[in-house]
């Protein structure tokens, strides 16, 4: 029997069951009804080891605590259709999500919905619920061509129903036909007009709320949160991210700021009555793809590899 560290944490009930099936010594002592545990929302199972259990070590507690984590869904995901930024091809991405036992997955490419049809079809065929979205760029006025605002603040929009999908298509279309300046851009008037059926998330460090927090302008951050809540109601979420890289240069630019922003977002959540989610800024599939992704960023920005500071997980 392999060495087991306690408590043992599993991503879902299925992986817990696979663990037990792979350790028949444990199964010979216990019988657990997983369906019942699920029906009552049970996420923690305690197993009491009898004194005769052959692998009970001296000094080890006799109760093994198994904690089953709730299902996690990636809601901030960039595919290869985030041009010169995303390095996750759709089919391998869905295959990886399936292997990890994920039941749903979002697509939120930068400023476009080019990959939505392919993503929807591949995910559906794999039995994964596709969540269709976009990471938009928000400026004060989409009609103004101001170089100081050509980038815009990042904002995640997710369609929660057919109405939301239609409104998302309209918003993204207008970002090209009316707001394009270096990038497809939208403004808050479009959000007010076409918010129905959409879930809105505050996005990464490039979002309007995190940017205000990093400027130490909590008053502005609160005003922005309250505006989005007034438009989207309970469908507005603050987005927490944490991406330690192990590289001191990158961590100083990203991870340390994320720690600062997350603390402030949690305070704003409590103060403004806004819910929050946890996400990863997914741009590639496997950890070993990070180097290739850094090269892609260099092609996009024209910077040297040593100057790349932002890495995605």
Predicted segments with their positions:
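Cationic, low-complexity basic patches in intrinsically disordered or flexible, solvent-exposed regions
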Residues: 19
């Amino acid at each position: 029997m392999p060495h087991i560290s306690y408590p043992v944490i599993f991503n879902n009930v299925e992986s817990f069951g696979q663990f037990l099936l792979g350790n028949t010594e444990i199964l010979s002592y216990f019988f657990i009804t997983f369906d019942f545990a699920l029906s009552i929302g049970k996420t923690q199972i305690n197993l009491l080891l009898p004194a005769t259990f052959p692998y009970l070590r001296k000094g080890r507690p006799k109760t093994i605590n198994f904690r089953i984590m709730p299902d996690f869904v990636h809601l901030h995901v960039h595919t290869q259709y985030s041009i010169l930024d995303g390095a996750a091809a759709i089919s391998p991405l869905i295959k990886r999500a399936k292997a990890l036992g994920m039941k749903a997955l979002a697509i939120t490419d930068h400023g476009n919905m080019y990959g939505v049809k392919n993503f929807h079809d591949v995910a559906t065929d794999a039995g994964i619920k596709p969540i269709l979205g976009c990471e938009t760029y928000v400026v004060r006025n989409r009609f103004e061509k101001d170089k100081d605002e050509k980038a815009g603040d990042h904002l995640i929009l997710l369609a929660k129903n057919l109405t939301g999908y239609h409104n998302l298509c309209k918003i993204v279309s207008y970002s090209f036909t009316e707001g394009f300046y270096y990038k497809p851009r939208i403004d808050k008037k479009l959000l007010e007009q076409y918010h129905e059926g959409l879930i809105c998330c505050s996005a990464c460090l490039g979002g309007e709320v995190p940017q205000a927090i990093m400027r130490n302008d909590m008053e502005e951050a609160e005003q922005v949160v309250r505006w989005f809540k007034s438009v989207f109601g309970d469908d507005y979420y603050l987005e927490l991210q944490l991406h330690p890289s192990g590289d001191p240069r990158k961590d100083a630019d990203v991870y340390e700021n994320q720690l600062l922003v997350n603390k402030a977002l949690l305070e704003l959540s409590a103060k403004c009555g806004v819910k929050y989610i946890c996400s990863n800024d997914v741009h590639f599939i496997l950890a070993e793809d990070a180097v290739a992704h850094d090269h892609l960023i260099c092609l996009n920005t024209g910077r040297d590899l040593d100057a790349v500071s932002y890495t995605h997980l």
